[in-house]
Amino acid sequence: MTSFSLPAFSRLSPRIARAEREHHQLQAYFRLHRQDVERGDWGALSAVSLGVHNVYNGLEDILISLARDVDGAIPLGPTMHQDILDQMAAEISGIRPALLDEPLYEALTELKGFRHLVRHKYGFDLHPERVVENVLRLDGAFPQVIKAVVWLHGLLSTPAP
């Protein structure tokens, strides 16, 4: 489990562990059922799409925790899901540098859009190629988010010269 010494990061260890477990389960299922997904099997498409949805929720939960406990402000309202990504991609002067670089921000924005589709379309618009594309996108983005969080913790843990 990833552990942190700063109080502002204290909620993250169990959140990261939960998201990692979900991501590993998704990867294992996808390895076994990728051909079913590519063929358009409804059960496999639904299971894998929901897995991407759930892992993205875990990543968003981590970002919301950082917004609350490091930045001191959580976006609210109908655009909060995009706003949290915007906030994490921006430097907060005197508090922290940008957490998300442009490619990671774009990947998370795409995953957020896919999550919205899964959540609100009930599987009717799940196309096999989009599902595979988003599993692969998540496989790239997930470790980058965790690495960025660990990097930020290290940066904020280091006393200023």
Mark where each language-model region is:
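Solvent-exposed interaction patches of small proteins and small membrane subunits
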Residues: 1-161
